[in-house]
């Protein structure tokens, strides 16, 4: 009897536990609604503080190159220099409207003069600053801070003079684009693309290379040249375009991973095997090995905002979809100012291949590549730049010359531009092989065609900011 009661109590308790556990409320949690979408849990971390850059301390009036008593439209009349005048002077390549917008939105700040008010010092050691208006009168030693994004707006005005309703460039733009041409024959056009000029334009971009080529680079043909490969907007160097449908098809095969080696013509296959592209890049740090082969597949992922994509190494990332990516590299010299020059030869053609391989595979991101090397840039700028001379073993450092023009965009500037340049390229002579392959077997080849080389080699000079970095690192050593 006692055992039956005990068993009944156990069953009763079990039933009660099951019953009330089902109706028990779940643990408390926060429900957030944004854009008609409900989210559980605490909110995500908000945006990080805006990254800022500082202008040099204000040197005084008049500014270099300005007349002391001249009245100007920048608001520096009457013997005073305003804040917007100083910003326009420093960022002379940026539109006045963009600079005015930064002032209107309250994005321009100034350090408290002389840092005299100790009570304003923040506990975390941050520099105390205040927002200023465009007509703030500058005093000697004043220091202005702006968002880093303003330096990314340095686009030459000659690219933005096309009216929004038309894609036809004006005479100055046509002349400028034609000066970029380094080689031209019946099959191809080779240009030395400057940085910040987009190659492939989207709907709102009217100044891309493909949009301007039809009007500026047709050179008498009914149709303009077409792109056969791409360079990133910030990347400079050799860019090849096809002038005819046949040459475009051949170039597409040449720039593919198969390198066009699928023809019965042995000379063509041999020329395709000899084809290569060579880039020069300035990287932060120095690879452990002086030369080598990077074989690291890449995957493209979409970030949380649903709009921005990013290329990552597929190895160890858990992504199944990936593309093979192979790059040869060679270090060109010793590390100077915490950086070293590297020669890159891509064997495959993948989006952002060189930038990701340098940043993630070698651990040495390219100078000016803030997408794949922002944290390394931040740490690099905070470190003392002292290096060891490889032959003598003595320390040396880079002499930092005075003057704004010397440092703009170079390795010494606050925000360096991307230091990646397609310097050299070897291609099959498309015009010659098209003539040979289209020639009837019974017809003899013209002597002038036979004498032409099977390969064409091109070399493009570096843009100004990379030339400055090269000269500084090779000539200004203490």
Curated annotation (Swiss-Prot):
One of its GO terms (cellular component) is mitochondrion. GO terms for biological process: pseudouridine synthesis. Its EC number is 5.4.99.-. GO terms for molecular function: pseudouridine synthase activity; RNA binding. This is RNA pseudouridine synthase 3, mitochondrial. It is found in: Mitochondrion. It comes from the Eukaryota. CDD domains: PseudoU_synth_RluA_like. Pfam families: PseudoU_synth_2. It comes from Arabidopsis thaliana (Mouse-ear cress). Residues 92-162 form the S4 RNA-binding domain. The active site is at residue 232. InterPro entries: PsdUridine_synth_cat_dom_sf, PsdUridine_synth_RluA-like_CS, PsdUridine_synth_RsuA/RluA, RluA_PseudoU_synthase. The keyword Isomerase applies. Gene3D superfamilies: Pseudouridine synthase (3.30.2350.10). Belongs to the pseudouridine synthase RluA family. PANTHER family: MITOCHONDRIAL RNA PSEUDOURIDINE SYNTHASE, RNA PSEUDOURIDINE SYNTHASE 3, MITOCHONDRIAL. Its main location: mitochondrion. Keywords: Isomerase, Mitochondrion, RNA-binding, Transit peptide. Residues 1-20 form a transit peptide.
């Amino acid at each position: 009897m006692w055992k039956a009661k005990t068993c009944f109590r156990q069953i009763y308790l079990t039933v009660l536990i099951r019953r009330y556990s089902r109706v028990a409320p779940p643990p408390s949690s926060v429900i957030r609604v944004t854009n008609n979408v409900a989210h559980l849990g605490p909110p995500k971390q908000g945006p990080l503080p805006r990254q800022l850059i500082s202008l040099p301390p204000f040197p005084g009036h008049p500014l270099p190159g300005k007349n002391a008593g001249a009245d100007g439209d920048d608001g520096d009349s009457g013997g005073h220099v305003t804040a917007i005048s100083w910003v326009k002077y420093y960022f002379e390549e940026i539109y006045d409207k963009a600079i005015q917008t930064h002032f209107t939105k309250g994005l321009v700040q100034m350090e408290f003069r002389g840092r005299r008010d100790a009570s304003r010092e923040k506990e975390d050691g941050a520099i105390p600053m205040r927002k200023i208006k465009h007509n703030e009168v500058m005093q000697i030693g004043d220091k202005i801070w702006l968002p880093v994004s303003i330096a990314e707006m340095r686009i030459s005005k000659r690219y933005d003079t096309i009216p929004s309703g038309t894609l036809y460039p004006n005479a100055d733009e046509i002349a400028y684009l034609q000066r970029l041409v380094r080689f031209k024959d019946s099959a191809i056009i080779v240009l030395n693309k400057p940085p910040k000029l987009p190659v492939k334009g989207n709907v709102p971009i009217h100044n891309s290379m493909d949009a301007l080529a039809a009007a500026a680079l047709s050179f008498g043909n009914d149709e303009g040249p077409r792109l056969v490969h791409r360079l990133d907007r910030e990347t400079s160097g050799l860019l090849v375009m096809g002038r005819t449908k046949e040459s475009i098809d051949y170039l597409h095969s040449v720039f593919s991973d198969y390198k066009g080696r699928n023809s019965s013509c042995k000379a063509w296959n041999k020329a395709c095997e000899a084809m290569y592209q060579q880039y020069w890049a300035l990287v932060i740090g120095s690879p452990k090995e002086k030369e080598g082969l990077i074989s690291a597949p890449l995957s493209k992922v979409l970030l949380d905002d649903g709009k921005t994509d990013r290329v990552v190494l597929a190895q160890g990332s858990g992504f199944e979809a990936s593309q093979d990516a192979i790059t040869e590299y060679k270090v060109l010299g010793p590390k100077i100012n915490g950086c070293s020059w590297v020669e890159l030869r891509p064997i495959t053609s993948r989006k952002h291949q060189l930038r990701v391989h340098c940043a993630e595979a070698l651990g040495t991101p390219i100078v000016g590549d803030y997408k794949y090397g922002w944290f390394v840039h931040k740490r690099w700028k905070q470190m003392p730049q002292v290096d060891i001379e490889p032959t003598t073993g003595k320390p040396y450092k880079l002499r930092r010359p005075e003057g704004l023009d010397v440092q703009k965009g170079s390795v010494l500037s606050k925000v360096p531009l991307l230091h990646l340049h397609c310097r050299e390229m070897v291609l099959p002579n498309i015009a010659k092989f098209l003539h040979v392959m289209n020639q009837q077997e019974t017809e003899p080849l013209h002597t002038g065609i036979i004498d032409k080389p099977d390969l064409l080699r091109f070399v493009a000079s570096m843009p100004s900011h990379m030339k400055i970095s090269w000269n500084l690192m090779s000539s200004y050593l203490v």
